Design a protein with these regions (language model features):
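RNase H-like nuclease fold core
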Residues: 1-60, 64-67, 158, 179
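Acidic/histidine-rich catalytic cores and adjacent linkers
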Residues: 49-60, 66, 96-215
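Alpha-helix capping at helix-to-loop junctions
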Residues: 21, 84, 88-92, 103, ...
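Conserved beta-strand -> loop -> alpha-helix junction used to position metal-binding or nucleic-acid-contacting
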Residues: 53-99
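Short, charged/polar low-complexity linear motifs in solvent-exposed/disordered segments
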Residues: 18, 41-44, 81, 89, ...
Length: 215
């Protein structure tokens, strides 16, 4: 499941069955919120759907509440989170090495990935603990390398969700939301071929497109 936006405050939340590639639910939204995903999931359950697993882009509040449903964090979104925290021109050696480890995620097993991540942490532990020499107005000495710490903290936070597909091999859980991303790109290309549509007709076009994908 994922949400895409066509302009500010104009998006659509879509849920797809990975086994059939069919859209099973979609809802127009103004912004991306956990509550919208919860409502969409509840509507599916009310219709009799059995939700065996969920692959999403890391909705923290939502993940905590889905106790009985295996949740897979999209690995490409995880890599993107790390890359945003460690910009393209990031200079520290620790940050550069962490970017390399993050990029290896989609081709790694859980054991291999976290063995490399733990080795990285041991190597750079002192670096991560470095604090500024100047205290702030509260007398607190902040950490120097907050971007690197933040990237590492994100990888640790999602640790239990990055390799759910390995734990439940019988379910064939998707480890990325690539199918939906591909659907969104195709939808937007089709919309671009119909420039000049009014807002109402654009909504009708999107509905027709997604309805055909649910057949």
């Amino acid at each position: 499941m994922d949400t895409t936006f066509f302009r500010r405050y104009s998006g659509v939340l879509v849920m797809m069955d990975s086994k059939t590639d069919k859209v099973v639910s979609y809802h127009f939204v103004r912004m991306e919120k956990d509550i919208y995903y919860k409502l969409a999931l509840n509507r599916l359950r009310e219709k009799g759907y059995i939700i065996q697993s969920i692959t999403c882009d890391g909705r923290r509040g939502l993940m905590k509440e889905l106790f009985n449903t295996p949740v897979q964090m999209c690995q490409f979104h995880m890599v993107a989170i790390v890359m945003r925290k460690l910009r393209k021109k990031h200079q520290s050696q620790a940050g550069k090495e962490l970017k390399i480890i993050a990029k290896s995620l989609v081709k790694s097993s859980k054991n291999d990935f976290y063995r490399r991540l733990y080795a990285w942490f041991i190597k750079h532990e002192d670096f991560l603990k470095e604090r500024s020499d100047k205290g702030n107005e509260k007398g607190y000495f902040p950490y120097k390398h907050r971007n690197v710490r933040g990237a590492y903290a994100s990888l640790k936070y999602y640790m239990n969700y990055l390799f759910t597909f390995e734990k439940h091999t019988e379910m064939n859980i998707e480890h990325t939301t690539n199918r939906l991303e591909g659907l969104f790109k195709y939808l937007k290309r089709q919309l671009n071929n119909h420039n000049g549509l009014t807002k109402k007709r654009k909504v009708m076009f999107i509905k027709d497109f997604l309805n055909k994908k649910s057949c």
